[in-house]
Curated annotation (Swiss-Prot):
Gene3D superfamilies: 2.30.30.100. Belongs to the Hfq family. Residues 81-97 have a biased composition (Polar residues). It comes from the Bacteria. One of its GO terms (biological process) is regulation of RNA stability. Keywords: RNA-binding, Stress response. Residues 74-97 are annotated as: Disordered. This is RNA-binding protein Hfq. GO terms for cellular component: cytosol. It holds the Pfam family Hfq. GO terms for molecular function: RNA binding.
């Protein structure tokens, strides 16, 4: 991953972790995982739910959907100008053939 990719990814995952935001993680194979981000590094995300902590490889993740908006504080921006990101997911039904 490029340095620019990390500049977006790390603050987002860190905000989810610090604020204990429930998330849905969709894998590239369509499986949906739910829990809270416990930790992460360059290659994996630790996702905790009520019964288990799962190590999810980032290359298997398609989408991370927070249950609510999170406040992203970019380290290279002044504290007076926080950035908020709101993610909205819409399900689209494919017409039957």
């Amino acid at each position: 991953m490029t340095a620019k990719g990390q500049m977006l990814q790390d603050p987002f995952l860190n905000a989810l972790r610090k604020e204990h935001v429930p998330v849905s993680i969709y894998l590239v194979n369509g499986i949906k995982l739910q829990g809270q981000v416990e930790s992460f590094d360059q290659y994996v995300v630790l996702l905790r739910n009520t019964s288990v902590t799962q190590m999810v490889y980032k290359h298997a993740i398609s989408t991370i959907v927070p249950a609510r908006s999170v406040n992203l504080q970019h380290e290279n921006r002044p504290q007076a100008a926080p950035t908020s990101t709101l993610v909205q997911v819409e399900t689209v039904q494919q017409p039957a053939e």
